[in-house]
Amino acid sequence: MSFFNRSNTTSALGTSTAMANEKDLANDIVINSPAEDSISDIAFSPQQDFMFSASSWDGKVRIWDVQNGVPQGRAQHESSSPVLCTRWSNDGTKVASGGCDNALKLYDIASGQTQQIGMHSAPIKVLRFVQCGPSNTECIVTGSWDKTIKYWDMRQPQPVSTVMMPERVYSMDNKQSLLVVATAERHIAIINLANPTTIFKATTSPLKWQTRCVACYNEADGYAIGSVEGRCSIRYIDDGMQKKSGFSFKCHRQTNPNRAPGSNGQSLVYPVNSIAFHPLYGTFVTAGGDGTFNFWDKNQRHRLKGYPTLQASIPVCSFNRNGSVFAYALSYDWHQGHMGNRPDYPNVIRLHATTDEEVKEKKKR
């Protein structure tokens, strides 16, 4: 079913990279004013194509359904402080959230009830539902500014285990048994969830400036890092594979309108706020503070398609379970702190129907 009233077909491209224009986004579903403050996270249900949750700095998590192309708010639950992250349980029956009240909360879709199941001593920046240990037990892992990650059994209030991190946790992601944690001071901790309490490998981001986001490959053999300096790095767990296939590249940079004609003046550099991998094709998207998003093919090392600058930064983006829908927020990303925000700053969630032209790897002829 296509709720965007257009087919998901493949069309040929004359080159390996293409720039879109605003007409390519004309059929996007737009949710205006989805929250009273900036959107911090978006997560799709792993069991439904058109249902997702969005957390916000206004202290709420809202659940949306766009099954028929008309956005409908299905539920919301509140916190006393900004909510920084949200994710769904693997069976799609519960939505977890964490934020600046330091609490891990679990919302039950069927009952509409919210329970607090855990606490940190500082804000929870990121969380994931993972399967741990030899028995692949489902639990929640949270990463906090208190320099720890904690594993939680949803049936008890105390963490199953706590792992110290070298610094405050800024980002975290997992695929299969791979968990990658990115912290302040550019530290990267790699954990094999078969042995979840041990850091399998500790390394440092090759990017020179603060890490903004991390995302794992579908194959669970590596991860991508985005930084505040408008760079992305493609990394592999295996040292030999890293030497062969790892690389870094510039992105989310704009021409400085004030530079002199014909000069080689500096570009305007924006943070890479969010990275997401297509669940079927393994290509990926970066979204940035410049208000653009780009689809990339890491294996062929080229951009599949770039999009025009929109009216606000993009703090977060996400694919649905089969990659047919790409959601992104236009919202303040807090990169410039409190002083950079303003009352009239846009606050929008948009849903874009992907085409193979945009997101599928193009084989070499």
Curated annotation (Swiss-Prot):
SUPFAM superfamilies in UniProt: WD40 repeat-like (SSF50978)
A Pfam cross-reference name: WD40
GO biological process: nuclear pore localization; nucleocytoplasmic transport; poly(A)+ mRNA export from nucleus; post-transcriptional tethering of RNA polymerase II gene DNA at nuclear periphery; protein transport; regulation of mRNA export from nucleus in response to heat stress; RNA export from nucleus; septin cytoskeleton organization
Keywords recorded for this protein, A-Z: Membrane, mRNA transport, Nuclear pore complex, Nucleus, Protein transport, Repeat, Translocation, Transport, WD repeat
GO cellular component: cytoplasm; nuclear envelope; nuclear membrane; nuclear pore
Keyword Lipoprotein: no
The keyword Repeat appears for this protein: yes
InterPro entries attached to this UniProt entry: G-protein_beta_WD-40_rep, WD40/YVTN_repeat-like_dom_sf, WD40_repeat_dom_sf, WD40_rpt
Superkingdom assignment: Eukaryota
Cellular localisation: Nucleus, Nuclear pore complex; Nucleus membrane
Chief localization: nucleus
GO MF annotations, alphabetized: RNA binding; ubiquitin binding
WD repeats: 34-74, 78-117, 119-162, 267-306
Membrane topology type: Peripheral membrane protein
Assembly description: Component of the nuclear pore complex (NPC). NPC constitutes the exclusive means of nucleocytoplasmic transport. NPCs allow the passive diffusion of ions and small molecules and the active, nuclear transport receptor-mediated bidirectional transport of macromolecules such as proteins, RNAs, ribonucleoparticles (RNPs), and ribosomal subunits across the nuclear envelope. Due to its 8-fold rotational symmetry, all subunits are present with 8 copies or multiples thereof. GLE2 interacts with the NUP82 subcomplex via NUP116. It also interacts with NUP42.
Database matches in PANTHER family: MRNA EXPORT FACTOR AND BUB3 (PTHR10971)
Miscellaneous comment text of the record: Present with 1820 molecules/cell in log phase SD medium.
Family from the record: Belongs to the WD repeat rae1 family.
Chain's role: Functions as a component of the nuclear pore complex (NPC). NPC components, collectively referred to as nucleoporins (NUPs), can play the role of both NPC structural components and of docking or interaction partners for transiently associated nuclear transport factors. It is specifically important for nuclear mRNA export.
Name of this chain's protein: mRNA export factor GLE2
Gene name in the database record: GLE2
